[in-house]
């Protein structure tokens, strides 16, 4: 699948309030198609749009990350202060934990797919114009807040630890997370999370070579494999052996 279609699909599957914050790949391609040779004025306009897109990513990413930190802290405090909470409260906390975990995974995907879009459009620009924009621009992008996902990945793991805490009767974090997600399987956030995980896998498997512009390996999320498998159809059964009738 071409990247433009993959990005369009991912935007459609994202949370409605997130959709305006993704890369405007279509407009960047339109600007690119208007340039056929090195042109300082056209390059300046292209770079201005590119930098505006990066600023948009940074503002949205940092806002969401800060919100996640606050929500996770509040959840931890509620769990610690209500060890004998009513069943209704426990159910609400569990749903909030699942939603928070899902939104964090969506933000990891947001970082991944927007970076990939920038790298691809810059590669197209250099190929079309014979320029050398990609290397210096990507070097700057690698230092941008939206690309720095260490804190976010840590929050995901902390959230998985909270899942374990709110499902004390289950034998393992994976089982706890599985039960939480099954309870939320009809929610849009669940489907969006699975779509994000699949997209991250697709993006990283799109190239067999490693280079300066490659995404870092996807940090494994301990409970993501079963999440993906839970909505994928089972593999077809092996073909049966032909019936041999003795003569």
UniProtKB/Swiss-Prot annotation:
Compartments in which it is found: Nucleus; Cytoplasm
Segments traversing the membrane: none
Chain positions covered by the region annotation Disordered: 224-247
GO cellular component, one term: nucleus
The entry's keywords: Cytoplasm, Nucleus
Tissue: Predominantly expressed in roots. Expressed in root epidermis, exodermis and the sclerenchymal layer. Under Pi starvation, also detected in mesophyll and phloem in the vascular bundles.
Gene Ontology biological process terms in this record: cellular response to cold; cellular response to phosphate starvation
Keyword Cytoplasm: yes
Residue stretches making up the SPX domain: 1-139
Coiled coil: none
Induction record: Up-regulated under phosphate starvation. Down-regulated by SPX1 and SPX3. Up-regulated during cold stress.
InterPro entries: SPX_dom, SPX_prot
UniProt biased composition (Pro residues): 232-241
Pfam families according to UniProt: SPX (PF03105)
Source taxon at top rank: Eukaryota
Subunit structure: Homo- and heterodimers with SPX3.
PANTHER family: SPX DOMAIN-CONTAINING PROTEIN 3, SPX DOMAIN-CONTAINING PROTEIN 5
Function: Functional repressor of PHR2. Involved in maintaining cellular Pi homeostasis when plants are exposed to an external change in Pi. Negatively regulates root-to-shoot Pi translocation redundantly with SPX3.
Official protein name in the record: SPX domain-containing protein 5
């Amino acid at each position: 699948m071409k990247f433009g279609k993959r990005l369009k699909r991912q935007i459609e599957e994202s949370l409605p309030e997130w959709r305006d914050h993704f890369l405007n790949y279509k407009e960047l391609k339109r600007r690119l198609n208007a340039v056929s040779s090195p042109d300082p004025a056209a390059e300046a306009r292209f770079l201005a749009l590119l930098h505006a897109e990066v600023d948009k990513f940074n503002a949205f990413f940092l806002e969401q990350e800060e919100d996640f930190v606050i929500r996770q802290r509040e959840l931890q405090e509620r769990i610690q202060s209500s060890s004998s909470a009513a069943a209704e409260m426990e159910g609400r906390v569990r749903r909030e934990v699942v939603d928070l975990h899902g939104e964090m995974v969506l933000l990891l995907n947001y970082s991944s797919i927007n970076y990939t879009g920038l790298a691809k459009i810059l590669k197209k620009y250099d190929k079309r114009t014979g320029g050398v924009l990609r290397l210096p621009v990507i070097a700057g992008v690698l230092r941008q807040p939206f690309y720095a996902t260490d804190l976010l990945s840590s929050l995901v793991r902390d959230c998985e630890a909270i899942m374990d805490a709110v499902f004390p009767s289950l034998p393992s974090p994976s089982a706890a997370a599985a039960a939480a997600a099954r309870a939320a399987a009809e929610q849009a956030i669940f489907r969006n999370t699975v779509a994000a995980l699949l997209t991250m896998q697709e993006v990283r498997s799109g190239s067999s070579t490693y280079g300066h512009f490659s995404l870092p390996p996807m940090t494994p999320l301990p409970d993501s494999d079963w999440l993906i498998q839970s909505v994928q159809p089972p593999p077809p059964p092996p073909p049966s052996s032909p019936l041999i009738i003795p003569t």
